[in-house]
Amino acid sequence: IAFMLEDLATAESLLANYTPESKYLPNLACVYGLMARVYMWDEQYANAATYARKAIDASGCTPLTKEQWLDVNNGFNNINSNNAWMWGIKYSPENMGNLCNFTGWMSGEADWGYSSLTLPGIDKSLYDQIAFSDFRKYTFLDPDRSVYPYETCRDQKWIDDAVDYQAIKFRCLGGDWEDYAVGGAVDVPVMRVEEMYLIEAEALGMSEGVDKGVAA
């Protein structure tokens, strides 16, 4: 822990006045986010809350909207389509295969990777705990497809035939589910501002009481 925090303290000083050309490179807010993660893992909750808040404030980021979360073409695949991602990496179509790429593992809509066979989804008991007022629930297919007008880059038959509770969170870039070099050339989130809000809330709850965490 001490070694990691020492390195992060060095990064904090070196990146203090640095503005990267894109979010593919970390900035000071990302350093604070990493420090929040380390402190949270080490159960130093007060410090975790402090650095999560510093990450939020320094990032200038805002949580995803419902429209961004459920976007058929850009959902969780385009760093420039939202203001929530603090840091990400990008796949290049020149150095990826149909199997060795993030979307091929995570997107059930993709037709080129293992995900079309493994059908990633959510456990029923966890799904049932998510309120229908929480739009994040709609990235998983309810057994009763009429509860929400699910959208996909495929067609309605694909929605109807998909397994219950299948995930449609990670989308193919531009909605291209057939060409891995296009639909799989996505951005992958490394750090999002929502994570910092969750760390702050949990850390405050652990250090100052549940009410403080709920209010965060």
Question: What kind of feature is each model-predicted range?
Answer:
Residues 201:
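Active-site-proximal region of nucleotide-activated glycan assembly enzymes
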Residues 1-194, 206-214:
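Structured, solvent-exposed acidic/aromatic patches
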